[in-house]
Amino acid sequence: MSTVALLFALSAAASPAADAATIAAIEATCHDYVDGQLEADPQRVARSLHPDLAKRAVLGDTPDERLGLRRMSKEELISLTRQGVLKTPKEQWNRSCRILDVTAETAAVRLETPWFVDHFHMGRFGDRWIIVNALWHPKPR
């Protein structure tokens, strides 16, 4: 076994599994984010987001920017939710939240819908988990 593989194996073994309450809280935050958009419920979306949210999508090189990013603030996402941009009848919902990693204070989560994939970094603030960073990409239509 290579040294790098051994280090990864040891670090994975040293990380205790998150308890059921932590997993449920992280999943609830992910569902507040996506279900709030699908319901057009801006308050539900807002409670899932850090005030200094960094939501970005990779654009690549543009005429105005090398390594371009589409940037979105918490306020912009809440405004789009209020407008009902993703409002969808509940019987058509198709979304999944998959927790990739959890530490005492952070979590990495993958959200997938038919329209987009989000990769979240969540932070634990007291007993609340909220989305601090989101890197997303649209799915081909």
Describe the role of every protein-language-model region.
Residues 108-110, 115-141:
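Short beta-strand edge/turn micro-motifs at domain boundaries
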Residues 10-43, 47, 51, 67:
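Short, low-complexity N-terminal intrinsically disordered segments enriched in polar/charged residues
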Residues 24, 73, 137-141:
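Ligand-binding grooves and catalytic loops that recognize ribose/phosphate and carbohydrate rings
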Residues 65, 69, 129-132:
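Tryptophan-centered short beta-strand motifs
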Residues 54-59, 67-116:
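Surface-exposed, charged secondary-structure patches
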Residues 59-61, 126:
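Solvent-exposed strand-loop boundary residues in beta-sheet-rich modules
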Residues 1-7:
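Sec-dependent signal peptide recognition
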